[in-house]
Amino acid sequence: MKPFRLLILTPTALPAVTGNAMTAERWRRCLVGMGLDVRVLPTEGLAPGDLKGEIIRFRPDLVHVHNAYRAGGLLLRRALDQGFGTLPLVVSPSGTDMNVESKVDAGKDRVSRVLSRAEAIIVQSEEGRERLHEIAHGRMDRVHFVPKSFVWLGEETLDLRASCGFDPGDVVFFMPAGIRPVKGNLECLLGFEKVYNLRPGARIIFAGPSLDADYSEHFRKEVEQRQAFARWIPPIHPAAMLSAYGSVDVILNGSASEGLSNVLIEGRAAGKPLLASDIPGNRWPVFGDPGDPPMGVLFDPSDPDDFVRKAILLVDDAMLRRKLGEAGAAYSRRMPGPCDEARGLVAVYEAAVGRTRGERVAGRG
C-alpha cells in the first residue's frame, strides 16, 4: 500500500526565506519522518492550471492549505473548484487571515469560503482559536489545536554583528522579517533613529526579502540615510539562523498582525530577549503561560515614543536582557518538539479523511 500523499499549499516555500516557508519545511521534514509522502507547493504566481496539473500528477489523499487567503484562494477558481471539490481539505489560517483579510469584504469572503470547504481547521495559538469564533463560528466543531514548535535547520556560522561592521560593545537589535507594511519594518527603523540619538551604542539589523515593492523602496532609501546605526541585509539562510540569533542582543518584532511568530519562538529558544508590538498574537511568546516569568517587553505600536522607551530600557539594562533571555530559553526547553507537532498534524489529517475512509495516515503501507 502506498504512503499517504499530502500536498501542502503555502504562499512561499524554500528556497524563499519567509515564515510560511519555514513552517512548511518544518512540517515536511517531520511528516516525511513519520512515513508520509509530502509535497510542498508555493502558490505565489501559480496559475490554476498548473495547480490542477500538479494535483492530477501527485494524486494527494489530502490537501493542507497554509494561509487561507493567499494559498487557499486558488482552490476557489472554477477550474479547481469543480473538479476537486471532494478532495479532503485541511486549512491552517494565518494571522493575516484572521486579523486583516477577514475584516475587509473581499478578504472576508475569500477566507470564509476557504474555511467552509475545510474538513478540519488548524490553529496553533489560543488567540487564534478565539479569533476563529468570530470568523468561523459555524465551523468550530472542526477546529483543532496543534501546539506550534520550532526546529533549527542547520548549524552554519554567521556573526551578524561583525558582518555588519558593528562593535562588540554595541547593543544590536535584530528584526528578521519580509519588508511589507504589516511587519512594521519602516516604522521600527524610524523609531530606532530616536533610540540611536539617545543611546549612540544602539544598532539595528533588518534581514528579509522585499515583499511589497513601493514600501520596500521607501524602506531602502531610509536605511541608506541611516547607515550609522542600521543595516538591511538579504534573507539569512535557515541553516545559519541559530548562529545569527546568537550574535545579537535583542530580537525585534513590530508586526501589526501575527498568528504566532516563528521569529519570536526561535529568538527566545536562542536565549535572547524579545521586543515586540503589543498585539494579541505576540503576547504569549513574550509572557508565556500564567505564572511564567516574562521573556521580553511589549510596546504600543500606536505610540512611537513607547517603542523608544522600551528599546532604551533594554539597551540600558544588560541584567534585564540576560534575565529575559534565560527565561525564554528555559520555557523553550518545555515546549513540544517538532515531532510532537507532526503527530498533532497527523491526528488532524486522520480526522479529516476518516469521515469518509476510516483509515490511518502515518505509517500506512
Residue ranges and their predicted role:
Residues 288, 292-304, 313-318:
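Conserved acidic donor-binding segment of nucleotide-sugar-dependent glycosyltransferases
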Residues 273-276, 280-283:
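Short hydrophobic beta-strand element within catalytic cores of glycosyltransferases
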Residues 116-141, 150-154:
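A short, active-site helix/loop in glycosyltransferases that binds the activated sugar's phosphate group
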Residues 176, 203-217, 234:
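Glycosyltransferase donor-sugar binding loop
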Residues 166-193, 205-207:
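Conserved donor-binding/catalytic core segment of Leloir-type glycosyltransferases
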Residues 217-236:
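Nucleotide-activated donor-binding/catalytic signature segment of Leloir-type glycosyltransferases, i.e.
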Residues 235-236, 243-248:
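Short alpha-helical donor nucleotide-sugar binding micro-motif in glycosyltransferases
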Residues 256:
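Aromatic "clamp/platform" in nucleotide-sugar-dependent glycosyltransferases that forms part
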